[in-house]
């Protein structure tokens, strides 16, 4: 979110209250769920209050589903409940298609609960230009407590080990990462209170004839023979990130 001009009224001393010096703070106080990092200009945001009509859902295995759910949420009354299949690929997916963006620094953010029966949780941001695809992906492995990223060779490279996330249905962990699609490189990543500098790490690219568009894909894989479930909320895509 652009922070705008200063609130010049804050320069005048007040007896009982303090003036605001940041428009992002004002937006949050008025009820926006863009409350985690607050940088960049919002392209798309969804708290699933109106259902999942703007998303393509899917999965693999017996019992997989992705639905609007009112049991747990980070903000508002609803979230997206992702139930992984218990057989075959054991997955649940939540995909968002967007128009081909102006090339620059784009941010991808969402919040999710964690569960002991989840094996991996990943988010991919792919841009297709009609000839190639450029993919930025982060993967969290619940079993090993390692956060990895997809490198230019298509391999998963550790970004942080020993990253244990509390498993509680009312606790949503927030993940955000920024990608420089103009220069095809990662910029930075954040998970809760931690952050990592990913400057100059190149993206994975491959040939693709898909027409120009952008795809954000959130995917969870559960353990064998159980229908592992997590809740996802506060999906945010930003542009003009620093």
PLM regions with names:
Residues 171-187:
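Localized edge beta-strand/strand-to-loop motifs within extracellular or lumenal beta-rich domains
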Residues 52-88:
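Extracellular glycan-recognition surfaces and repeat-rich motifs
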Residues 48, 230-237:
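Extracellular beta-strand elements of beta-rich domains used
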Residues 33, 94-100, 160-167:
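Beta-strand-rich interaction surfaces with strong enrichment in secreted/lumenal proteins
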Residues 77-150:
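Secretory/extracellular carbohydrate-interaction modules
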Residues 151-174:
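Short, aromatic/His-centered strand-loop micro-motif at the edge of beta-sheets
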Residues 2-60:
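Extracellular carbohydrate-recognition regions
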Residues 199-233:
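Flexible glycan-contacting loops in extracellular carbohydrate-active proteins
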């Amino acid at each position: 979110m652009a922070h705008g001009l200063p609130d010049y009224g804050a320069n005048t001393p007040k007896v009982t209250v303090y003036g605001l010096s940041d428009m992002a703070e004002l937006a949050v106080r008025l009820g926006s769920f863009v409350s985690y990092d607050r940088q960049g200009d919002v392209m798309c945001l969804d708290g699933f209050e109106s259902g999942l009509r703007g998303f393509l859902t899917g999965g693999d295995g017996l019992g997989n589903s992705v639905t609007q759910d009112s049991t747990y949420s980070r903000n508002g009354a609803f979230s997206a409940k992702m139930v992984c299949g218990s057989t075959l690929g054991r997955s649940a997916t939540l995909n968002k298609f967007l128009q081909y963006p102006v090339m620059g620094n784009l941010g991808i953010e969402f919040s999710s609960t964690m569960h002991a029966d989840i094996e991996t949780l990943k988010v991919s941001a792919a841009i297709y230009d009609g000839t190639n695809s450029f993919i930025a992906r982060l993967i969290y492995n619940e079993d090993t407590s390692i956060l990895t990223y997809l490198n230019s060779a298509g391999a998963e490279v550790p970004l942080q080990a020993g990253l244990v996330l509390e498993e509680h249905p009312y606790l949503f962990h927030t993940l955000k990462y920024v990608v420089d699609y103009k220069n095809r490189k990662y910029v930075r990543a954040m998970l809760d209170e931690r952050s990592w500098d990913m400057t100059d790490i190149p993206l994975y690219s491959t040939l693709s004839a898909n027409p120009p568009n952008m795809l954000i894909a959130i995917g969870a894989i559960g353990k064998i023979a159980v229908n592992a479930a997590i809740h996802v909320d506060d999906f945010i895509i930003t542009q003009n990130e620093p």
